[in-house]
Amino acid sequence: MARLFVAVALFGVVAFAAAEKEWTGKTWLGSWASTDRAENWEAFVDALGLPSDQYPREVQRTIHTIYKQGDKYHHEVSIPSKNFKKAIEYTLGTETDVQHGPHTIKLKYTEDGEKLVADVQIPSKNKQIHDIYEVQGDTLTKTYKVGDVVAKRWFTREANPTA
């Protein structure tokens, strides 16, 4: 009986420890809130050719939360004014499918030095987006590229949650 309690106690501790979110080890891990600063955003949205309800032409306050939990990374994107939230679970270097409305999107996150890179394919629209997340201090610059069009948005680090 004592062995059972020890096994349950150990399993519970291991399972709990594996479930904790990690916020350190990569510069781009954290919670990032958009600023009002954007460059070439309307041209980027036009190049996507997606409906404006999916990608508004005006810059919306956006929050990116990126953390590691166990062997997986998680990227949560939220746009509070649209009551929109998308959670993506991924492994660096491995393509993953994400449903976004009627579209299945293929994502592959990799690293380029200190930068997080996301290659996004929207097969139903024959579009590819190349995103780069680059951190300097408490500022994250996200560069978006579709075709020859490049846009940028800037984000500031929010206090990381403890769990």
UniProtKB/Swiss-Prot annotation:
<keyword id="KW-0346">Stress response</keyword>
<feature type="region of interest" description="SAHS-c3">
    <location>
        <begin position="108"/>
        <end position="157"/>
    </location>
</feature>
<feature type="region of interest" description="SAHS-c1">
    <location>
        <begin position="22"/>
        <end position="51"/>
    </location>
</feature>
<comment type="function">
    <text>Secreted heat soluble protein acting as a molecular shield in water-deficient condition. Tardigrade-specific intrinsically disordered proteins (TDPs) are essential for desiccation tolerance by forming non-crystalline amorphous solids upon desiccation, and this vitrified state mirrors their protective capabilities.</text>
</comment>
<feature type="signal peptide">
    <location>
        <begin position="1"/>
        <end position="19"/>
    </location>
</feature>
<dbReference type="InterPro" id="IPR012674">
    <property type="entry name" value="Calycin"/>
</dbReference>
<dbReference type="GO" id="GO:0005576">
    <property type="term" value="C:extracellular region"/>
</dbReference>
<keyword id="KW-0732">Signal</keyword>
<protein>
    <recommendedName>
        <fullName>Secretory-abundant heat soluble protein 53582</fullName>
    </recommendedName>
</protein>
<keyword id="KW-0964">Secreted</keyword>
<comment type="similarity">
    <text>Belongs to the Secretory-abundant heat soluble protein (SAHS) family.</text>
</comment>
<feature type="region of interest" description="SAHS-c2">
    <location>
        <begin position="67"/>
        <end position="95"/>
    </location>
</feature>
